[in-house]
């Protein structure tokens, strides 16, 4: 996939919606809906659902439990809708007895977020080596010497799938495979984008992968080298 070879890492989110009937506007405002899934779009979903309620729409409770858990909750019919960073496959769709509509919702960039006193620029090969746990000192990245701690997702995650797809495209030295979860050889695991960002925020010397919207405070975004040799930070414009 050509997009995976750009300097920024891309992810998108699908919403899984059960078939439903029509209701009057008065009934609609009293509806309570529950959803669960990807943490990648959680911030924009929270904003949208707040605006929806303020405009007389239904009250929506969304839990950012990760794509894998959200899909399971939707299949098990414990929520009204789910959110996943990639579409459901036929074998999972067959398990949904109430009907299913998959709607593309949002796209965004995944950043290498880090907490260290350094203007970090990563080549694609360096990015792969960091994620594989091959680099454990900031000096190897042209920064002042210090312990480097890799932070990754511990739950089934569409963000992880998009991230590992890009790592595989970046270099043939990537050997961890791709998917919502992989066997990380080292590092600290955390649930959700917020969990990973929290560990980075509280751990000087930490680096991991997060949705661009979690880049704030002590969590800075690394610039990643593209195929033209330029170092690019993830932004709305770049994505």
Regions found by a protein language model. Give the residues of each.
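Exported/periplasmic ABC-transporter solute-binding proteins
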Residues: 20-96, 100-239
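Short, low-complexity disordered leader/linker segments with a strong preference
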Residues: 1-32
